[in-house]
């Protein structure tokens, strides 16, 4: 690794001992080695800290931080972004797995085309035992040269796992970071797309894990937002209508900040208005679910047998 690493991998974790070691093995076993791994432990109460300390002693690329209290998922994610020293940045999760060549191929794609702002790969879903159960379709036209088309497609055509791609850090810091409202990951990713096209490595190198304990399974908007930031737990200060309005305002703010012409911004505002009109419904904590107000993810059976062990560096396995 160079004195100042070219890439920062940021991993925010809270009580992740069940899959954390697996994820660290996959990240530290990457064929691309010029990166630092910034871990922010959100005051975990399980064995996460011990795992992080053990790996930090073995690999100097790890910078481990522990929050004195639970600051919430969103501020914890933003903390690792603020700590980044690399010109490139990738968000990692404690329970996901990564093919050995993921970072190498994403960095190469960004080097080959300075106009691209983010590179990722095709993704598949794995279970608790790291077996592939389905693949994530990617019908989104994030490679379009026109920002207006990328914006339209991300609102109407579906969704993927772009927020976990390798992105140019300067672009990342031009916009808003992770908000503490429902779907903040989507406004975050769409803002990146307004700055430039994405590139998808045509291979399954990212494995998103579905398991019973993950925060993404929280369906109630109030509970989800309180997980993102404990200050959201106050029901009176954070009615559902406000959380929904913040979500919509996230898109408006992204358009306002984007490096677009007045005509392009006007086009995006009209697309957003059409999208909102098509989804107008009474907003309650039940209706504002993961797929209720944004392009839905679609899945398919694996087109071929995909072996996680064949492409992912594996060492320690999950804590049972």
Over which residues does each language-model region extend?
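Short aromatic/hydrophobic "clamp" motif used to bind/position activated sugar donors
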Residues: 89
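Short, well-formed alpha-helical segments that are part of the catalytic scaffolds
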Residues: 15-29
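Conserved donor NDP-sugar-binding/catalytic core segment of glycosyltransferases
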Residues: 101-135
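Glycine-rich, basic loop-to-helix element that forms the pyrophosphate-binding segment
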Residues: 67-84, 97
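A conserved acidic beta->alpha catalytic loop
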Residues: 41-50, 69, 93
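Conserved nucleotide-sugar donor-binding catalytic segment
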Residues: 9, 82, 99, 143-225
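Short loop->beta transition adjacent to catalytic acidic/histidine clusters or analogous donor-positioning motifs
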Residues: 4-7, 28-39, 47, 60-63
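Acidic helix N-cap motif at the loop->helix transition within catalytic regions
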Residues: 21, 46-54, 101
